[in-house]
Amino acid sequence: MTRESWRVPVRVDFAGGTLDLWPVYAMMGGCVTVNAAVDLWVEIGLSRSGAGHRITSRDLGLELKVEAWPPEPPPGLSWVWRVLDASGVPPADLTLHSPVPQGSGLGVSSCLGVGLLGAAMGLEAGEGLASKVPILRDLESRELQTPTGWQDYYPAALGGALALHWEGP
């Protein structure tokens, strides 16, 4: 069983953090969000083959072991399940670790989503992975049952410092 390792950076916002929400940027006639990837990494280890499925979150102290991929999100791992389910290729074994706690304001869940989708689909950081941002935004909106923006995902997908332009009509 071959084990793969993936890492994605979390991000910090400098300006325009909520301006990426529709219809805010449309009402303003366009705006800019400035953020950057930082040297704090969400780590994902996975194996694509094996019997059943196992998801382990070292930070949350959660482990899920199932024979078949569950049809509904499991408690405590619903975001992970939602992204992997959307990928169409959930791995046999998955281990997650983040040095940054959830709720820190550094976009951990969004960055985790980018890493999970990239790892499951075999997409490295770059334009290919960034093209999946609309899927992740919609999945997170469904997960949270609230509108979500775009900007949290791009530093994890592209790296570096970014000035993201949101155009109005």
Where are these regions (language model features)?
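ATP-dependent small-molecule kinase catalytic core of the GHMP/sugar-kinase superfamily
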Residues: 2-11, 16-33, 57, 122-169
